[in-house]
Swiss-Prot record:
Reactions that this protein is recorded to catalyse: a beta-D-Gal-(1->4)-beta-D-Glc-(1<->1)-Cer(d18:1(4E)) + UDP-N-acetyl-alpha-D-glucosamine = a beta-D-GlcNAc-(1->3)-beta-D-Gal-(1->4)-beta-D-Glc-(1<->1)-Cer(d18:1(4E)) + UDP + H(+); a neolactoside nLc4Cer(d18:1(4E)) + UDP-N-acetyl-alpha-D-glucosamine = a neolactoside IV(3)-beta-GlcNAc-nLc4Cer(d18:1(4E)) + UDP + H(+)
Pfam short name (any one): Galactosyl_T
EC number, UniProt record: 2.4.1.206
Function: Beta-1,3-N-acetylglucosaminyltransferase that plays a key role in the synthesis of lacto- or neolacto-series carbohydrate chains on glycolipids, notably by participating in biosynthesis of HNK-1 and Lewis X carbohydrate structures. Has strong activity toward lactosylceramide (LacCer) and neolactotetraosylceramide (nLc(4)Cer; paragloboside), resulting in the synthesis of Lc(3)Cer and neolactopentaosylceramide (nLc(5)Cer), respectively. Probably plays a central role in regulating neolacto-series glycolipid synthesis during embryonic development.
Protein known as: Lactosylceramide 1,3-N-acetyl-beta-D-glucosaminyltransferase
Residues bearing attached sugar chains per UniProt: N58
Recorded topology in the membrane: Single-pass type II membrane protein
Keywords: Developmental protein, Glycoprotein, Glycosyltransferase, Golgi apparatus, Lipid metabolism, Membrane, Signal-anchor, Transferase, Transmembrane, Transmembrane helix
Disulfide bridge positions per record: none
Subcellular locations according to the entry: Golgi apparatus membrane
Gene Ontology BP, a term: lipid metabolic process
């Protein structure tokens, strides 16, 4: 009997020993990248004050007097889009030539100008900004883009290849177009084509800001003290030759952000003086803003690169959510249902929604959507 018990204890210890070894090995394998990630962010954040407060970053990226930004002629344009109109919001949607289905879904939902005019009593202008199809995709796609624009009249296109590494050219397209053809729009917004925008909430928010005449306004999901990615295998790799500093100036996630028209004008002017080889467009925006002294403000209901949890209590105050390439129309119907506002009515409704938001938003896992403090906003 003692031998049997002793044997069980030995097997148990062997199991725990094996488990401990596996745990340690797993920890060693995964801790390296995690530790590097944590340390790089801690290091970059420690430089944040210097990066945001002094001009040495901008000086190192400024164009020489003999240099100019590359010029890309328009292939599709609508210079009359804003003429002689009182425009609350000029909204650019960054899209790829092949993403017709996404553009179509946006036109049927939150990007419908007629809906915003008739139901929300606001005049907004929406344009899809893009470059040219990759040469391997041939001329047929360009022909389809021309046909699409003849139907909807909402595309602007310049003559540069539409690719990830040309996103800053697309940034220059948007702010250049706004500066030339629609400088009087109260606000400028830029968004990805897989974003969801709760247009009723956004319009209500902007109309309130318009009444108080807000200036120096730049809002979105703010990244503070983010480090450049030095891993060559990463999509976001930035070599030292392109950007040598350990941290970026504060910037908003490129998924969606809004600026007032005075900021849009300043950003355009700054963009003409900085080297556009920095192909991460939201970082380039941060560099431009840093040069003219504009500071981003964080809004808890602007999503980062993450998708928000689906629930009516979340929809009540949401403004943007990222990553909706397939479910845009269903989410539009659910989120804009008038019954959503009824859920949080009354004392018990407010308590219920507060608890739901805490459960959905206050998690240890990083979601890059709404922060925990949004549950208490």
């Amino acid at each position: 009997m003692r031998v049997f018990v002793s044997s069980r204890r030995v097997k148990r210890w062997q199991f725990f020993h094996l488990f401990a070894i596996c745990f340690i090995l797993s920890f060693m394998v995964f801790w390296g990248p995690i530790n590097n990630y944590i340390m790089s962010h801690m290091k970059s954040y420690s430089y944040r004050y210097l990066i945001n407060s002094y001009d040495f970053v901008n000086d190192s990226l400024s164009l020489k007097h003999s240099s100019v930004q590359p010029h890309h002629p328009y292939l599709i344009n609508h210079r009359e889009k804003c003429q002689a109109q009182d425009v609350l919001l000029l909204l650019f949607i960054k899209t790829a030539p092949e993403n017709y289905e996404r553009r179509s879904a946006i036109r049927k939902t939150w990007g419908n100008e007629n809906y915003v005019q008739s139901q929300l009593n606001a005049n907004i202008k929406i344009l899809f900004a893009l470059g040219t199809p990759h040469p391997l995709k041939g001329k047929e796609l360009q022909k389809r883009l021309i046909w699409e624009d003849q139907v909807y009249h909402d595309i602007i296109q310049q003559d540069f290849t539409d690719s990830f590494h040309n996103l800053t050219f697309k940034f220059l397209l948007q702010f250049g177009w706004a500066n030339t053809f629609c400088p009087h729009a109260r606000f400028l917004m830029t968004a990805d084509d897989d974003i969801f925008i709760h247009m009723p909430n956004l319009i209500e928010y902007l109309q309130g800001l318009e009444q108080v005449g807000v200036r120096d306004f730049w809002i979105g999901h703010v990244h503070r003290g983010g480090p450049p990615v030095r891993d060559k295998s990463s999509k976001y790799y930035v070599p030292y030759e392109m950007y040598k500093w350990p941290a970026y100036p504060d910037y908003t996630a490129g998924a969606a952000y809004v600026v007032s028209n005075d900021v849009a004008a300043k950003i355009y002017e700054a963009s003409q003086t900085l080297n556009s080889s920095m192909y991460i467009d939201d970082v380039f925006m941060g560099l431009c803003a840093n040069k003219v002294g504009v500071v981003p403000q964080d809004h808890v209901f602007f999503s980062g690169e993450g998708k928000i949890p689906y629930h009516p209590c979340i929809y009540e105050k949401m403004i943007t959510s990222h990553g909706h390439s397939q479910d845009l129309q269903d989410l539009w119907v659910e989120a804009t249902d008038p019954k959503v506002k009824d859920i949080s009515k009354g004392f018990f409704g407010q308590i219920y929604c507060r608890l739901i938001k805490i459960v959905l938003l206050c998690r240890l896992t990083y979601r890059n959507s709404y922060p925990c403090r949004a549950a208490f906003a």
